[in-house]
A protein has these predicted regions:
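CN hydrolase (nitrilase-like) catalytic-core segments centered on the catalytic cysteine
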Residues: 62-79, 146-229
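Short loop/turn motifs at secondary-structure junctions
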Residues: 2, 31-32, 136, 158
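Conserved hydrophobic/aromatic positions in well-ordered beta-strands
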Residues: 4, 95-97, 105, 210, ...
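Cys-nucleophile CN-hydrolase/nitrilase-fold catalytic domain and related Cys-dependent amidase chemistry
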Residues: 15, 19, 23-100, 106, ...
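Active-site-proximal beta-strand elements of phosphoester/diester hydrolases
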Residues: 1-14, 37, 93, 106-109, ...
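Active-site catalytic loop in hydrolytic enzyme cores
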Residues: 85-157, 169-178, 182, 239-248
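C-terminal beta-strand edge segments of enzyme domains
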Residues: 129-131, 196-275
Length: 275
């Protein structure tokens, strides 16, 4: 699979500007690109509560349809984020459109970041995977990647590749780079993180997008703010699982905790009990 890590600046609450930049990136992608991955809330940026009515979209909104049309015309799958309106609520949502222009996967961010998500979005509650270019692909959004359980949930759905649509700001940029390497190793799958760049609402976004193989090796990373390409080979997944498989060999599902205390209430021992 050939992936374009399409990190780019995002104009908060300016859907038309962001859509134009996305369409240009899709149309000008190399012809052999299988999947283009954009950052978190690509279309909307980070809206305030008052801006939701202006930038919020349903999955049938015109900007979404235009991206579907561009994916179909370019014969390329596209993963992107937006502010979704549904059932009277707003969600920080990612969509994966396949090369035919069909919405193959929709994911709502499950772990909301206090500064930009709380009070604006409702949290999602489900994980999903779909097949793109012969790989099973799942999606996470930004803060999600800091919780091992999120990536493990996708691995339990047999994900070969975890995409992270990121909107991580300074000074936290390195946190997600470390996390995505760990998640790839823990689940013996590929992981691709795409972060936004530039400034927005007093925040600075460093980019530092990266693709990681199932051994935790960095395949490509962006060091100059420009998009980069990665080629993922399925054989690497099988190689990483040849001698051991974490999903098969794990015991703690779930883990129980047993504490031993003295008479004055001090904890003496903590034992982890495999479920």
């Amino acid at each position: 699979m050939n992936i374009l890590l399409a990190q780019l600046p995002i104009a908060d609450a300016q859907v038309d500007i962001n859509l134009s930049n996305m369409l240009s990136m899709i149309r000008n992608a190399p012809i052999d690109t299988d999947l283009i991955v954009f950052p978190e809330t690509t279309l909307s940026g980070f809206p305030t509560k008052d801006e939701i009515g202006t930038v919020g979209l349903t999955t049938r909104g015109k900007p979404i349809r235009r991206i579907q049309e561009a994916a179909r015309s370019s014969n390329t799958a596209v993963a992107f984020g937006f502010c979704e309106l549904a059932d009277g609520r707003a969600y920080n949502t990612a969509i994966l459109v396949d090369r035919s222009g069909r919405i193959a996967l929709k994911y709502r961010k499950t772990h909301l970041w206090p500064d930009t998500d709380w009070g604006v979005f409702d949290a999602g509650s489900q994980y999903a995977v779909c097949e793109i270019a012969s790989l099973r692909v799942g999606v996470l959004i930004c803060y999600d990647i800091e919780f091992p359980e999120t990536a493990r949930s996708l691995a339990l759905l047999d994900a070969d590749l975890i995409l992270v649509l990121d909107g991580n700001m300074d000074p936290y940029g390195p946190v997600h780079r470390h996390a995505v390497i760990s998640r790839a190793m823990e689940n013996q799958c590929f992981a691709v993180l795409v972060n936004r760049i530039g400034e927005g609402k007093g925040l600075s976004f460093p980019g530092e997008s990266v693709a990681v193989d199932p051994f935790g090796n960095v395949l490509v990373e962006s060091t100059d703010g420009h998009p980069v390409r990665a080629t993922l080979q399925r054989e690497r997944i099988e190689e990483s699982r040849k001698n051991y498989r974490y999903l098969r060999d794990r015991r703690a599902t779930p883990m129980g905790v047993e504490r031993s205390t003295s008479e004055d209430g001090v904890v003496n021992t903590v034992s982890v009990i495999p479920g």
